[in-house]
Amino acid sequence: MNSVLISLSVTAAFFVVAAVLGFRLGRSPKPYPKLLLSVHALMFFAIAYGIGACLDKLSKTATDASITKVVLLVALGLLWANLVSGIVMICLKKKNRGWILAHKLVMFAMAISFVAAGVFMAMKW
């Protein structure tokens, strides 16, 4: 179970990097800087790989961590919703506050999912 917590911690670190880069992108004028945008998009793949690694390690452990798996699957679904809102924001000509708010709310919900997964893993649920 310790290796799962390490994987979740690394994934959370990638999540923090993505949030910081997103904050910088939010302060940038359109068109967005290509380097920041590409690194921010690459963080999507790092986070998706990290969630997949956590789910894979959970499936190999002997403990029944069904609640943790559900929370990680919710985080994965939120990650896909975040990708869609990010692509829409890139395609729009002007900054749209509604899409920015949706992107931030999904990121916040994903952060709550990561914290909940860590708590449930620590409690071995």
Question: Where do the language-model regions lie?
Answer:
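Membrane-embedded alpha-helical bundles that constitute the cytochrome b-like, heme-associated redox core
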Residues: 1-125
